[in-house]
Amino acid sequence: MAAINVKALKGEKGYSTLERNSCRPSFDICGIWGGYTGEGSKTVLPSKAYAKVSCRLVPHQNHAVISQLFVDYIQSIAPEYVQVKVTPMHGGEGYVCPITLPAYQAAEKGFAKAFGKKPLAVRRGGSIPIISDFEQILGIKTVLMGFGLESDAIHSPNENFSLDISVSYTHL
């Protein structure tokens, strides 16, 4: 924890930090703003405030139901003198690629051939909503296999990807 400069990690009881960070549902506040946002301070109360949030869903959670539960909850806790407007955007169902799937096992063999070792099966939350549609509508499972490294800093300002790895995975 010293590497990320925190004293302790908290979260859902009964689950490890790895589980909470990868395969459990999450609610994330992506941004909050309102009132004066320039440099310096102001003693003005904002007339409006905004927030952007997202949720990681897991299998058997319906994005429309979860979205409505969120809207209902926010409206239920808002004081009567506060106007609340919640605008649901888009969503998709949760999906897990079974590692027992023949297509996964074939990809695993190709990975081992290209990289000299089997991939580590790790569940990671992500947003590819059409994957669950493939299963529900077309009746097919989709293999999801990442080729990046932790050092790639995916979705960060310093995101990068190794050219050596990208060339290696073309041999799968």
Ranges and model annotations:
Residues 1-160, 164:
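Metal-dependent amide/peptide-bond hydrolase catalytic core
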Residues 170-171:
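Conserved small/polar residues in nucleotide/adenosyl-binding loops
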